[in-house]
């Protein structure tokens, strides 16, 4: 690749001082926003898909969590290759796979085909969610790094909110209430975002690129760090909570009497409420307070779930807002802890991010599946509330240990 067109020479000018880092952040945000749109796009369409394909709640729960299952297998390898191939090509490839996953749902004829198409998202997804922190680690440092993490983390929340609000309100009416055509249009949008990334993104040439360490050696070294192991456990519980509750939230609200359109609006409240906290907290919480902050967010998450499941009216909306503020902040805080661990840094952030998302998405898969299975067994979502509270308490206990560890700056 020609330098200056698709790569950035670190020796000529540090990327952390280049104004182009903000261009990188902008297109990274856009790409991550469409990642969120792709992930959330199926939730507001659960009801027509269930009716059209004659699926059970358990089957739909398995579909909702299927991409996390493939993600688990792909993420560790994806992180290793992101470190090797660079961010420009890797994120472009991931975006193409996501566009295919969403667009091909148009052809789903039953449980099996839909499962395969949603699961394909887990092949491309790791390139985006792991490539994002890798990009920030390369292009930003100091307090700007916390700011950048907060900003790019709002991307999937904007994209997810757009999917929840616009799917039943805009796209479904425009497509004659065809969930198939809705997926097709979303796939085209993601493809256009991928092309924009390809034309504007820049890789960084560093002096460390010549070092070659085997993937097993890198992962073994990372797993020896206690702080990293704690982050992995917290990530496992966090993703189970976030993916489990948010995947089923529109249906939970429909069971409480909301129309599909109103349920989509209400389901976007946590996403929108979390955006201000993402823009502020990652920048201003000092590294030595991140463990305590995780504990506080875990308690707030557990409390908000009970408000959502057990109450109606204004207090339920309070629960949605508190859940958005608390749950949306967990992953950025864990990412910063991981990124600033001395054994990780920018050099191994791809591999460390792959390890983090590999473990975390086990929870991301089990969350929607277990909540769907609990509905089949109990006839309601209350049992899932007990599960979410238990996981939140697990985060509380584990996050308190992070404060005792030294976090590298």
Q: For each predicted feature, which ranges?
A:
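Residue-level signature of mid-helix packing/kink "hotspots" within the transmembrane helices
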Residues: 40, 68-76, 161, 271-279, ...
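Juxtamembrane intracellular "pre-TM" segments in multi-pass secondary transporters
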Residues: 8-18, 202-231
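C-terminal transmembrane helical hairpin of 12-TM major facilitator-type secondary transporters
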Residues: 289-337
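Extracytoplasmic gate region of multi-pass secondary transporters
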Residues: 42-44, 226-278
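Helix-loop-helix hairpin linking two adjacent transmembrane segments in secondary transporters
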Residues: 151-201
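Conserved MFS/SLC helix-loop-helix module at the cytosolic interface between two early adjacent transmembrane helices
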Residues: 73-109
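Cytoplasmic helix-loop-helix junction between adjacent transmembrane helices
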Residues: 117-155
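A late C-terminal transmembrane helix in Major Facilitator Superfamily
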Residues: 344-380
């Amino acid at each position: 690749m020609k330098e200056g067109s698709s790569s950035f020479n670190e020796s000529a000018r540090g990327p952390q001082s280049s104004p182009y880092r903000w261009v990188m952040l902008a297109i990274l945000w856009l790409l991550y926003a469409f990642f969120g749109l792709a992930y959330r796009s199926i939730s507001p369409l659960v009801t027509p898909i269930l009716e059209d394909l004659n699926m059970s709640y358990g089957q739909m729960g398995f579909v909702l969590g299927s991409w996390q299952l493939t993600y688990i297998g792909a993420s560790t390898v994806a992180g290793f290759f992101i470190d090797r191939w660079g961010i420009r090509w890797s994120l472009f490839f991931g975006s193409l796979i996501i566009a295919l996953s969403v667009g091909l749902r148009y052809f789903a004829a039953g449980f099996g085909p839909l499962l395969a198409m949603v699961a394909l998202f887990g092949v491309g997804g790791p390139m985006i969610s792991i490539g994002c922190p890798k990009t920030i680690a390369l292009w930003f440092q100091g307090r700007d790094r916390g700011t950048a993490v907060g900003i790019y983390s709002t991307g999937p929340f904007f994209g997810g909110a757009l999917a929840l609000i616009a799917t039943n309100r805009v796209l479904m009416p425009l497509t004659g209430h065809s969930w198939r055509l809705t997926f097709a249009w979303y796939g085209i949008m993601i493809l256009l975002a991928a092309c924009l990334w390809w034309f504007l993104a820049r890789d960084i040439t560093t002096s460390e690129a010549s070092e070659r360490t085997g993937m097993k050696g890198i992962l073994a070294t990372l797993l020896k760090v206690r702080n990293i192991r704690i982050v992995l456990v917290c990530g496992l519980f966090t993703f189970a909570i976030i993916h489990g509750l948010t995947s089923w939230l529109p249906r939970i609200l429909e069971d409480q009497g909301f129309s599909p359109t109103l349920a989509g609006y209400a389901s976007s409240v946590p996403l929108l409420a979390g955006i201000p906290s993402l823009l502020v907290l990652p920048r201003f919480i000092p590294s030595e307070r991140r463990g305590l902050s995780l504990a506080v967010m875990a308690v707030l998450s557990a409390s908000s779930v009970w408000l959502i499941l057990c109450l109606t009216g204004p207090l339920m909306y309070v629960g949605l807002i508190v859940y958005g503020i608390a749950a949306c902040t967990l992953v950025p805080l864990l990412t910063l802890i991981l990124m600033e661990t001395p054994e990780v840094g920018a050099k191994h952030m791809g591999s460390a991010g792959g390890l983090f998302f590999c473990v975390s998405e086990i929870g991301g898969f089990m969350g929607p599946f277990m909540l769907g299975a609990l509905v089949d067994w109990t006839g309601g979502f209350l049992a899932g509330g007990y599960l979410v509270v238990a996981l939140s308490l697990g985060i509380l206990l584990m996050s308190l240990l992070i404060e005792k560890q030294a976090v590298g700056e």
